[in-house]
């Protein structure tokens, strides 16, 4: 008989289910287990088609209306539960069929202890779904979301009884009890130590004493291993084995019976032979009242197939998890003797219709910005999303309003439309903490656009899209670097219409400071519009206002890819190419402002540097990443920008001239980055090859991201 509680339920449950110690050790060391324990999605299951446009949001707060009152529902768990829920189903569903949902019929009889949240008392789990029972027993409050079994909300069993030998004794009256204490004594938690605070809340005073006539307690003290430190499995195994070897004589003295290793292996082999292969046929959906919504979910999982394999279900499961309309899905399956397949029971929690996002960027540079987003979602046979957001700050401000409709047809597709108002003030972003920007550019860009887009998925990580946009941009700038208070800026207005078709592929693990996956795109745009230039006081005298029509094609291609050579070292490669037949605008600076730019690092997005803008260019570089910890790394990045037919301010009237390829410009970044779970915390030194200030120091928390432009 095996009895476990808290994290120990994973080990005890897997052993009882027919997993050998070597198999469990390999499992705990695997990449899959890392993803299960952190809630992050593996690259192979990141479904890009459903991803919304990127924003600098930190946390999502759901809003619910109850009793005519609005109620804010902040996140209740740090680690998303979908990975863990699917893992337990994948590992233990066939075991349930083999033991017929009776834990006494496992390879070794087993039960575990959870905590009933509402009754604050132990819940003994001896039958039912083994994966759900283990999931309940190890659900540490605040880290994982509680699980409901038979109408009872359950948490970590260690909350009320972290060493349930008394339950074992009263219920089963065993001849000998062998216990293993791995819980360290409580340490005083610091005010800012959330992990320590949670550990102390969970670890209540526990009686670990067993009468010497009734059994033995092994004790392993883990000085440097804390709650959920799964990455330290090697140390845990080493220390645990050492404790067992030191106690083996005492254990042998208590137990006279001997079983050979071969006998245990044969018993495990016979039990595992009872496990049917995982194929799924019937699907039931719980938690969704609307029949059209249930049909939407079932069709997303099965499509037109009658039976699906585990691999097919896993891929479609994570596609649904990526759907903004669904908050969580807990998969439970039961073996159907009549069909020979498993029936899927999906406990679905729809996303609340109303959601508020909070985020932005806080830094030592005056690019601080706040962000608030609002989403309203609903779905039946189709999925509907209404989205708006607002950015506010000295450097960048914006407002966006739009909607998206998803059609779950055989080839899914979406239609979306957005109206956006953008404003950048590059002069306001130019002051520095350590390196003075002696000649900051006075550039203010106001841009508004209305975009319509449609697209469909191309495999898991890609989508094909096409769209149109109406855009109006107004750039204000000076023609010289030295200006007087009375000077008036030049103003260039460009009213345009554009069409685009493109392919995007994205499997990156983070929206900024990524270290895994790839991002690629190629797009072709046709842009037509009217440029109006109104000279200011720094233009050459007698410069008239001008109107010019522009019609041109713009081809853009980009690739970023990371190669994980070891657990410590990753190499990233980035390349970008832009080609167009766009004519120059009325003067040098307006030409640069209307040209595409190269922004390979977050900080580069906050500056306007003329050297890195051109109508045609090639650019690329490398990114070396040294992982100090899974979420903490050192990054060294270097890039080169090669303009083609570069505009140069060589003529007296500031009109551009061209050279095919003559110059190249360098930029780079050295940074320490820690991914906190809500946003990146970074300390960086940035270099740009340009006149005057070339080094920029930045301490930043959050994201430097903007709403999209029209072209």
Where are these regions (language model features)?
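Patatin-like phospholipase
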Residues: 1-5, 13-329, 333-335, 340, ...
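A glycine-rich phosphate-binding loop feature that marks nucleotide/adenosyl-phosphate handling sites
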Residues: 257-267, 469-470, 521-523, 575-578
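Extended beta-strand-rich architecture
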Residues: 498-504, 508, 515-653, 659-670
């Amino acid at each position: 008989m095996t009895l476990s509680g808290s994290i120990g339920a994973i080990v005890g449950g897997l052993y009882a289910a027919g997993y050998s110690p070597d198999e469990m050790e390999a499992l705990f060391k695997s990449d899959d287990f890392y993803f299960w324990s952190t809630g992050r999605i593996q690259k192979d299951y990141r479904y890009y088609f459903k991803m919304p446009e990127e924003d600098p949001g930190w946390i999502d707060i759901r809003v619910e209306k109850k009793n005519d009152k609005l109620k804010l529902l902040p996140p209740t768990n740090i680690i998303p539960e979908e990975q863990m829920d699917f893992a337990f189903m994948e590992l233990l569903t066939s075991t349930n069929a083999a033991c017929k949902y009776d834990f006494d019929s496992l390879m070794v009889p087993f039960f575990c202890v959870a905590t009933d949240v509402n009754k604050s008392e132990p819940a003994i789990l001896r039958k039912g779904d083994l994966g759900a029972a283990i999931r309940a027993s190890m659900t540490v409050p605040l880290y994982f979301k509680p699980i409901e079994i038979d109408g009872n909300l359950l948490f970590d069993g260690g909350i009320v009884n972290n060493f349930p030998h008394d339950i074992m004794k009263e219920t089963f009256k065993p001849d000998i009890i062998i216990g293993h204490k791995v819980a360290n004594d409580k340490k005083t938690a610091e005010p800012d130590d959330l992990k320590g605070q949670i550990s102390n809340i969970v670890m209540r005073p526990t009686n670990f004493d067993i009468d010497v006539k009734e059994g033995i307690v092994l004790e392993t003290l883990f000085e440097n291993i804390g709650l959920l430190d799964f990455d330290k499995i090697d140390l845990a195994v080493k220390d645990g084995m050492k404790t067992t070897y030191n106690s083996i004589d005492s254990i042998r003295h208590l137990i006279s019976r001997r079983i050979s290793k071969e006998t245990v292996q044969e018993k495990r082999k016979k039990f595992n032979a009872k496990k049917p292969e995982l194929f799924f046929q019937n699907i039931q959906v719980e938690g969704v009242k609307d029949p059209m919504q249930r049909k939407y979910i079932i069709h997303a999982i099965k499509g037109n197939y009658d039976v699906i394999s585990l691999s097919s279900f896993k891929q479609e499961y994570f596609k649904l998890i990526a759907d903004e309309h669904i908050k969580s899905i807990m998969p439970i399956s039961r073996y159907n003797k009549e069909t020979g397949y498993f029936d899927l029971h999906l406990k679905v929690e729809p996303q609340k219709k109303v959601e508020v996002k909070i985020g932005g960027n806080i830094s030592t540079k005056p690019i601080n910005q706040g962000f608030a987003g609002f989403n309203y979602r609903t779905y039946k046979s189709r999925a509907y999303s209404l989205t708006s957001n607002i950015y506010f700050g000295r450097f960048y401000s914006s407002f966006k309003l739009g909607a998206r409709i998803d059609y779950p047809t055989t080839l899914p597709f979406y239609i979306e439309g957005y109206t956006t108002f953008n404003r950048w003030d590059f002069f306001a972003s130019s002051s520095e903490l350590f390196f003075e920007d002696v000649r900051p550019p006075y550039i203010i860009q106001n841009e508004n656009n209305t975009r319509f887009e449609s697209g469909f998925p191309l495999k898991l990580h890609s989508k094909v899209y096409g769209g149109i946009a109406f855009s109006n941009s107004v750039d204000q700038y000076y023609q010289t670097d030295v200006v007087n208070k009375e000077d008036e800026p030049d103003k260039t207005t460009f009213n345009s219409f554009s069409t685009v078709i493109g392919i995007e592929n994205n499997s990156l693990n983070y929206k900024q400071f990524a270290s895994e996956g790839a991002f690629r795109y190629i797009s072709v745009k046709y842009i037509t519009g009217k440029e109006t230039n109104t000279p200011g006081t720094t233009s050459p005298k007698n410069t008239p206002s001008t109107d010019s029509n522009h019609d041109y094609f713009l081809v853009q291609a980009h690739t970023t890819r990371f190669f994980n050579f070891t657990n410590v070292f990753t190499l990233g490669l980035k390349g970008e190419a832009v080609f167009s037949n766009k004519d120059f605008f009325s003067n040098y600076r307006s030409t640069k402002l209307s040209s595409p730019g190269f922004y390979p690092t977050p900080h580069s997005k906050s500056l306007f540097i003329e050297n890195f803008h051109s109508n045609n260019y090639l650019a690329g570089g490398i990114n070396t990443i040294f992982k100090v910890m899974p979420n903490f790394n050192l990054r060294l990045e270097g890039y080169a920008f090669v303009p083609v037919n570069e505009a140069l301010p060589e003529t007296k009237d500031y009109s551009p001239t061209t050279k095919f390829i003559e110059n190249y410009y360098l930029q780079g970044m050295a940074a320490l980055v820690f991914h906190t779970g809500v946003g990146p915390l970074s300390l960086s030194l940035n270099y740009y090859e340009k006149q005057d200030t070339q080094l920029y120091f930045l301490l930043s928390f959050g994201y430097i991201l903007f709403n999209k432009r029209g072209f």
